[in-house]
Amino acid sequence: MSTLASTRPPPLKLTIPSLEEAEDHAQERRAGGGGQEVGKMHPDCLPLPLVQPGNSPQVREEEEDEQTECEEQLNIEDEEVEEEHDLDLEDPASCCSENSVLSVGQEQSEAAQAALSAQAQARQRLLISQIYRPSAFSSTATTVLPPSEGPPFSPEDLLQLPPSTGTFQEEFLRKSQLYAEELMKQQMHLMAAARVNALTAAAAGKQLQMAMAAAAVATVPSGQDALAQLTATALGLGPGGAVHPHQQLLLQRDQVHHHHHMQNHLNNNENLHERALKFSIDNILKADFGSRLPKIGALSGNIGGGSVSGSSTGSSKNSGNTNGNRSPLKAPKKSGKPLNLAQSNAAANSSLSFSSSLANICSNSNDSNSTATSSSTTNTSGAPVDLVKSPPPAAGAGATGASGKSGEDSGTPIVWPAWVYCTRYSDRPSSGRSPRARKPKKPATSSSAAGGGGGGVEKGEAADGGGVPEDKRPRTAFSGTQLARLKHEFNENRYLTEKRRQQLSGELGLNEAQIKIWFQNKRAKLKKSSGTKNPLALQLMAQGLYNHSTIPLTREEEELQELQEAASAAAAKEPC
């Protein structure tokens, strides 16, 4: 400062201001220049909102740079103010020597310097408070402290600065990122829902169009309704007059066509299932199935001069006409009435009569056991043989077949014959030969019956030699549902209780004996195929309580068994 004072020109007439005037002058400058500086520095020194997270080192470096710039500007301003005041105070003191200890205005200059330093500190605190004033982005609440009786500004106030805005910025950025993620998720859900709605709307639109088309077809008035109305009006106008034959024919034809269309519509699902079958049985179940072979036989028979009469009177006249040969084959189609096998004579051609009777059985049979066959090789009387109930020999040709009454009950459901459920090809009519059938037993002669030895008696007849053939049960034909149920029950338990057997007989419509025999046969087949013996049987065999057929008997046991058989045979002959 002394060098500045020495280089100046000689001072003019100056007056030394008092302490109060110096304070007033400093306050005016602080209010004028300092306020402008604060106004100028405030927008520049405020921290700007950052895009990057607050914890990054770049944000911290920028904040430190801004703070250092603000502090440097404040220091420069303070130095300028101090230099101005020093110049004002040194002007009157320049008259005195620099080496003198006691000068004229030295006491006042120390007091002025103390006051100026206090004012500079106050101004610095004001600037700092303006710079660190909480902004709108800050999440900290500002608390207004009551004015204290002490000094307006103290060094402790400088230490209590507001917290940094970095935490608020971090929280704001984190929440904004979460909000953006939620928005993206909602948009993705909305897009997926829109796609699903579009697909379902398209499918529903197609179904609606199909339903509308079906309803339109159903609501369209058909020609049959119009014809029916016209016929009704015609009949109402002229009740005594007869309908024209041409109109009646048209009406009948339309009715038949409409009925056929409705039948096809109702059986749509069944037709679909039948198409899916690899081998269909529709042709087998038709009445004229296998008719080609009899036609060939009929042609060969016509060459030989033989023919079969198709009349219902039972006459055995030979017409020699091919139409007479084919009429029994077409009878089930046209009339729907079954052929009476008792009145038909199969004298010349056995294959033709067999095919016609079999076709009748297939089309009109109501009982699976009514399998009647006629064969000229086994039956000389020409009457059909009923395998269900064999007639006595005295009845002769007067016995009627079971198939004669089969077509009468049209309301009952059709039950197919047993050969339909058989899997062997030889049992089907397409094999060219008759299904397996028991040959009728020949009546036993009196001599063979009186002989007592039973040499002339057939194997199947009764042991008492009464001459009546044994009534054997035909082979049981189970339906598909019955077999499936029986197999399911067998898999559940191989042995049935009496209560369970009764329940099954009621549910399946079978006899208890049939169910019992089926289970026995199933167990025997399983045992034979597996080759292993029942552990219970093995245990009983080891204890000697179970005599299996495979165990050889001793000589004494064989003799005892023969004695028992002889005693039983003698007891059976005594009542006769």
Curated annotation (Swiss-Prot):
Coiled coil: none annotated. Keywords: Developmental protein, DNA-binding, Homeobox, Nucleus, Transcription, Transcription regulation. The keyword Transcription applies. Residues 80-91 have a biased composition (Acidic residues). Transmembrane segments: none annotated. Residues 471-530 bind DNA. GO terms for biological process: compartment pattern specification; imaginal disc-derived wing vein specification; neuroblast fate determination; regulation of transcription by RNA polymerase II; wing disc anterior/posterior pattern formation. One of its GO terms (cellular component) is nucleus. Residues 450-468 have a biased composition (Gly residues). GO terms for molecular function: DNA-binding transcription factor activity, RNA polymerase II-specific; RNA polymerase II cis-regulatory region sequence-specific DNA binding. Residues 1-68, 80-102, 305-344, 364-410, 426-476 are annotated as: Disordered. Expressed in row 6/7 of the embryonic neuroectoderm. Residues 309-325, 364-381, 395-405 have a biased composition (Low complexity). PANTHER family: HOMEOBOX PROTEIN ENGRAILED (PTHR24341), HOMEOBOX PROTEIN INVECTED (PTHR24341:SF6). Belongs to the engrailed homeobox family. Engrailed (en) and invected (inv) are functionally redundant transcription factors in neuronal precursor cell NB5-3 specification. Inv is unable to substitute for en in other regulatory processes such as maintaining gsb expression in the neuroectoderm after stage 10 of embryogenesis. Maintenance of gsb expression in row 5 of the neuroectoderm involves an as yet unidentified short range signaling molecule. This is Homeobox protein invected. The gene is inv.
